[in-house]
């Protein structure tokens, strides 16, 4: 390196670009030569239609070095005020066990994995999710649970639609207890409007004899009241009502379960099991029901099956319920959920165990009882009579001064109504907190020890009929790992069973498994971000709001939109928020009848599932032989439905991995017939810096921050799916009933929410902020260019072995490519799933299987993979093709070969008798480099049919693990 470089070069402000992008300049040159392109710019010219290319580079800030970006974000974080939160309302401060913080939340072996569709290399997190399900089953008293939903409010909305599916009642009315959390009521209102349900919100006692298809109750209630709902539930069910109870897992450690009271569904948030509040998330919602309703339950379910050796193995059960298969007939559009957070919550319970949880839950209740008893003795008007952790009290004219005094002392109380305040306690609450708050309220001191002794000796604040009597959390997993050594080793043992980005590339098409840089992840753990309640006073969240505003402006620049709504917690939820905005727009113009949604047949399964959630009629548009939207068919159907056309949902580049030349014409056709264009942002990673949805002609689009903008997939969540909107749709995006997301005079102020928190999972927005801050305008454009280069390199190298199904007019693919396996299957019986399983033996996760075309695999390498890693993957795929040739040539039989027997486990190679026509080395070390970094699948191929026919979604007994 010459010593006379200018200082600007030595400062390396663009250093992170080289850290994020896999190939170096020399490797890029080699790859460009291999694909027949003179330069990166020429490749892009050959790939992206000139008509949609941006005329100038993105006006984003210059890139920052990692430590500079961290310092800038830390300066924002320092503007947040972390008071002790006593607001409650479903969000509570908590203590994350450090062994879980370090070894799960901060561990790329856990947070960079994908949804466990390839179960043989995901046994660790599948077991962890089974623990979560077992914990939920035990505490709710129901028979089956899913592996998480997005948040409590959307879980409540899902409960309503599930109730409609399973209820035998002919009523169109749904009862909502007025004592539910207001944010849950708000989201349920939004969802109900698009299903045409009549919502009845009120006192449940006044309506318990009414005619409803479903009901939503809260236990404990929003006001803290704990009541036995057994009789109410029995009365409702006698008339055919399906009853859902929103509850609190910590409270259920002590309280009678919803299942014991007769509930059909139980739901809520697992946040207080070790997950920081994070200004609203991310947090894993739980959802449980009766076994009879399992096929109608939304979300993913982990079940038990057996592998080819007959051993117990975990897998995702009943996948035919999901949106990617059933499309508009799916139970829900749920795709991303909250797997990482569910695993953390489950591990919190594993670590503390039943006894530890009872101690924590008992302490919370005792401190609340001490405060309540003190307030009663001080003649404070206590409004909550039977409580777990929350009390409301009427102070009349003194309420405002007490509220402000508490703020000054570092406590956030809840303003309930004029003169009424609320206090909720959590596991961080101390004796000193109780004494301080009592003095602020009663203006005298409290002898905590004396009151404690008296409360302990007296009758409980809860009647015996409400105290849990059944034993819970008895499975050995909840009673074994209580020392840190044991917990650490348990977590490590699970991690060792999973393949994540810390081992090798994950080339899942349409999933964008790029680098999740350590520097991007660090701020998520800062207490200045984790300790903020979503409904805290806005002047305590100045740093958050500054970060969100900054990210909003950057995303507007990147996408070409005029406004951003940060509320959706996933891409699928972003789709829903976008279609809701479109519907509200049409309604504002007196065109409520516009309800037809055009969707290409190649679309993601979430698109039709979301359209039906928004009460739209799906009309499928054909594709031509090249995989592009059939423009003539689109035009004919748009004109046929022009009086009722609401929108087109389209992915760009297409799900076939090609930049369609006619995209602007497609948008124009829809607009000419009165519709709006919704662009699915799943493939935005091929657009950034080169074009944008807004520039192309879309009216609204979601951005998968967990794809394009570096939030990790977490093994199936968290994610974020904010939407960008053009100015005419901006007034119709979601707002929030508790904490408005914008100015009070904004047109959409008060419009129904789609998520529980105003800014969704706000704490992980810091990841995308760091990503954009460190890459800058030049970096994000380079990332897109290299993503396209890597995909074309893979396509070129593999095309002779597996034909690339679709290419653009110049023979290029976008950021992903589809490899056609159908000729191989016709000749040998080897299917795409066999190739997927065999890749495990080479140390790779499979690409996307049989989407968007059955009998194919779709490869998306992303910009973050080096040429060396791409070459290893290419080498593995070519080696597998040569193995298939051995079957074609009759060397191996169609039913006994390395592909049909894949994956191979350590147990296989240790068998005394080897019954295969290929060697043990061929089975597990098929290429020389595999042995140096061997990943061992912990089970053999799993029997999916057996798992669904013998459904078991609870933790197996320990005997199941015996040899």
Curated annotation (Swiss-Prot):
<dbReference type="Pfam" id="PF02347">
    <property type="entry name" value="GDC-P"/>
</dbReference>
<dbReference type="GO" id="GO:0019464">
    <property type="term" value="P:glycine decarboxylation via glycine cleavage system"/>
</dbReference>
<keyword id="KW-0560">Oxidoreductase</keyword>
<feature type="modified residue" description="N6-(pyridoxal phosphate)lysine">
    <location>
        <position position="707"/>
    </location>
</feature>
<comment type="similarity">
    <text>Belongs to the GcvP family.</text>
</comment>
<dbReference type="InterPro" id="IPR003437">
    <property type="entry name" value="GcvP"/>
</dbReference>
<dbReference type="InterPro" id="IPR018247">
    <property type="entry name" value="EF_Hand_1_Ca_BS"/>
</dbReference>
<dbReference type="InterPro" id="IPR015424">
    <property type="entry name" value="PyrdxlP-dep_Trfase"/>
</dbReference>
<dbReference type="GO" id="GO:0005829">
    <property type="term" value="C:cytosol"/>
</dbReference>
<keyword id="KW-0663">Pyridoxal phosphate</keyword>
<dbReference type="InterPro" id="IPR049315">
    <property type="entry name" value="GDC-P_N"/>
</dbReference>
<comment type="subunit">
    <text>The glycine cleavage system is composed of four proteins: P, T, L and H.</text>
</comment>
<protein>
    <recommendedName>
        <fullName>Glycine dehydrogenase (decarboxylating)</fullName>
        <ecNumber>1.4.4.2</ecNumber>
    </recommendedName>
</protein>
<dbReference type="InterPro" id="IPR020581">
    <property type="entry name" value="GDC_P"/>
</dbReference>
<dbReference type="GO" id="GO:0005960">
    <property type="term" value="C:glycine cleavage complex"/>
</dbReference>
<dbReference type="GO" id="GO:0016594">
    <property type="term" value="F:glycine binding"/>
</dbReference>
<dbReference type="InterPro" id="IPR015422">
    <property type="entry name" value="PyrdxlP-dep_Trfase_small"/>
</dbReference>
<dbReference type="InterPro" id="IPR015421">
    <property type="entry name" value="PyrdxlP-dep_Trfase_major"/>
</dbReference>
<comment type="function">
    <text>The glycine cleavage system catalyzes the degradation of glycine. The P protein binds the alpha-amino group of glycine through its pyridoxal phosphate cofactor; CO(2) is released and the remaining methylamine moiety is then transferred to the lipoamide cofactor of the H protein.</text>
</comment>
<dbReference type="InterPro" id="IPR049316">
    <property type="entry name" value="GDC-P_C"/>
</dbReference>
<dbReference type="Pfam" id="PF21478">
    <property type="entry name" value="GcvP2_C"/>
</dbReference>
<dbReference type="GO" id="GO:0030170">
    <property type="term" value="F:pyridoxal phosphate binding"/>
</dbReference>
<dbReference type="GO" id="GO:0004375">
    <property type="term" value="F:glycine dehydrogenase (decarboxylating) activity"/>
</dbReference>
């Amino acid at each position: 390196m010459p010593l006379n470089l200018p200082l600007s070069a030595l400062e390396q402000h663009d250093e992170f670009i080289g850290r994020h992008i896999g190939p170096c300049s020399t490797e890029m040159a080699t790859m460009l030569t291999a694909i027949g392109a003179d330069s990166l710019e020429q490749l892009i010219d050959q790939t992206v239609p000139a008509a949609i290319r941006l005329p100038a580079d993105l006006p984003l800030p210059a890139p920052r070095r990692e430590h500079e970006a961290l310092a800038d974000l830390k300066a924002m974080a320092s503007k947040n005020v972390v008071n002790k939160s006593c607001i409650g309302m479903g969000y509570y401060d908590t203590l994350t066990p450090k062994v879980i913080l370090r070894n799960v939340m901060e561990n790329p072996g856990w947070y960079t994995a994908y949804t466990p569709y390839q179960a043989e290399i995901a046994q660790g997190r599948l077991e962890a999710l089974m623990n979560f399900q077992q914990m939920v089953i035990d505490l709710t008293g129901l028979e089956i649970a899913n592996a998480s939903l997005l948040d409590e409010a959307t879980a409540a909305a899902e409960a309503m639609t599930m109730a409609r599916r399973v209820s035998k009642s002919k009523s169109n009315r749904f009862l909502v207890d007025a004592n539910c959390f207001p944010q849950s009521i708000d989201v349920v209102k939004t969802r109900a409007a698009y299903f045409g349900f009549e919502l009845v919100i009120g006192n449940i006692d006044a309506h318990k004899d009414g005619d409803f298809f479903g009901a939503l109750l809260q236990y404990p209630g929003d006001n803290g009241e704990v009541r036995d709902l057994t009789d109410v539930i029995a009365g409702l069910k006698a008339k055919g009502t399906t009853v859902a109870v929103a509850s609190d897992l910590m409270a259920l450690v002590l309280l009678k379960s919803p299942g014991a009271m007769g509930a059909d569904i139980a739901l809520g948030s697992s946040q207080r099991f070790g997950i920081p509040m994070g200004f609203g998330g991310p947090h894993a919602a739980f959802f449980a029901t009766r076994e009879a309703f399992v096929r109608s339950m939304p979300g993913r379910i982990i079940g038990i099956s057996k592998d080819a050796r007959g051993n117990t193995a975990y897998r995702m059960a009943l996948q035919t319920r999901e949106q990617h298969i059933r499309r508009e007939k799916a139970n829900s559009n749920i795709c991303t959920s909250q797997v990482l957070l569910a695993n953390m919550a489950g591990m919190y319970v594993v670590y503390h165990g039943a006894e530890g949880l009872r101690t924590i839950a008992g302490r919370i209740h005792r401190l609340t009882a001490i405060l309540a008893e003190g307030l009663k003795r001080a003649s404070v008007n206590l409004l909550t009579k039977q409580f777990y952790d929350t009390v409301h009290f009427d102070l009349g004219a003194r309420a405002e001064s007490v509220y402000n005094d508490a703020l000054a002392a570092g406590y956030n109380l809840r303003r309930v109504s004029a003169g009424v305040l609320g206090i909720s306690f959590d596991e961080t609450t101390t004796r000193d907190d109780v004494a301080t708050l009592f003095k602020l309220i009663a203006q005298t001191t409290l002898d905590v020890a004396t009151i404690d002794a008296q409360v302990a000796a007296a009758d409980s604040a809860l009647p015996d009929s409400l105290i849990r009597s059944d034993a819970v959390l008895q499975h050995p997993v909840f009673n074994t790992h209580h020392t840190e050594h044991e917990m650490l080793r348990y977590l490590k043992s699970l991690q060792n069973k999973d393949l994540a980005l810390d081992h090798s590339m994950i080339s899942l098409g349409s999933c964008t498994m790029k680098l999740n840089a350590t520097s991007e992840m660090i701020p998520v753990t800062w207490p200045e971000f984790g300790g903020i309640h979503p409904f805290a006073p806005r002047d305590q969240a100045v740093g958050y709001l500054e970060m969100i505003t900054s990210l909003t402006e950057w995303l507007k620049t990147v996408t070409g939109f005029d406004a951003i709504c940060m509320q959706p917690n996933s891409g699928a939820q972003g789709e829903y928020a976008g279609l809701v905005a479109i519907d509200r727009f049409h309604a504002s113009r007196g065109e409520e009848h516009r309800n037809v949604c055009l969707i290409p047949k190649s679309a993601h399964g979430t698109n039709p599932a979301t359209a039906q959630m928004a009460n739209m009629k799906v009309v499928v548009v054909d594709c031509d032989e090249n995989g592009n939207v059939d423009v003539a068919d689109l035009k004919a159907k748009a004109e046929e439905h022009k009086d009722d056309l609401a929108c087109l949902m389209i992915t760009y580049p297409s799900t076939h991995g090609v930049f369609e030349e006619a995209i602007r014409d497609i948008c124009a056709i829809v607009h000419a017939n009165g519709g709006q264009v919704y662009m699915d942002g799943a493939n935005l990673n091929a657009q950034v810096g080169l074009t944008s949805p807004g520039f192309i002609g879309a009216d609204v689009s979601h951005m998968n921050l967990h794809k394009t903008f570096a939030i990790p997939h977490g093994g199936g969540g968290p994610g974020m799916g904010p939407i960008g909107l053009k100015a005419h749709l901006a007034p119709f995006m979601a707002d929030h009933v508790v904490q408005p997301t914008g100015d009070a005079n904004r047109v959409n102020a008060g419009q129904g929410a789609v998520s529980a928190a105003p800014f969704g999972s706000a704490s992980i927005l810091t990841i995308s902020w760091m990503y954009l801050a460190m890459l800058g305008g030049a970096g994000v454009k380079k990332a897109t260019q290299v993503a396209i280069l890597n995909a074309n390199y893979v396509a070129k190298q593999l095309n002779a072995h597996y034909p690339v199904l679709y290419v653009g007019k110049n023979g290029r693919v976008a950021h992903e490519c589809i490899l056609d396996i159908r000729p191989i299957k016709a000749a040998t019986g080897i299917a795409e799933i066999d190739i997927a399983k065999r890749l495990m033996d080479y140390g790779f996760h499979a690409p996307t299987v049989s989407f968007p075309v059955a009998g194919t695999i779709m490869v998306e390498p992303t910009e973050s993979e080096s040429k060396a890693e791409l070459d290893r993957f290419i080498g593995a795929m070519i080696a597998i093709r040569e193995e298939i040739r051995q079957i074609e040539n009759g060397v191996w039989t169609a039913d006994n070969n390395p592909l049909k027997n894949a994956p191979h486990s350590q147990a296989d190679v240790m068998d005394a008798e080897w019954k295969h026509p290929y060697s043990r080395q061929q089975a597990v070390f098929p290429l020389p480099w595999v042995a140096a970094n061997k990943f061992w699948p912990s089970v053999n191929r799993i029997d999916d049919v057996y798992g669904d026919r013998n459904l078991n979604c609870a933790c197996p007994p320990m005997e199941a693990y015996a040899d």
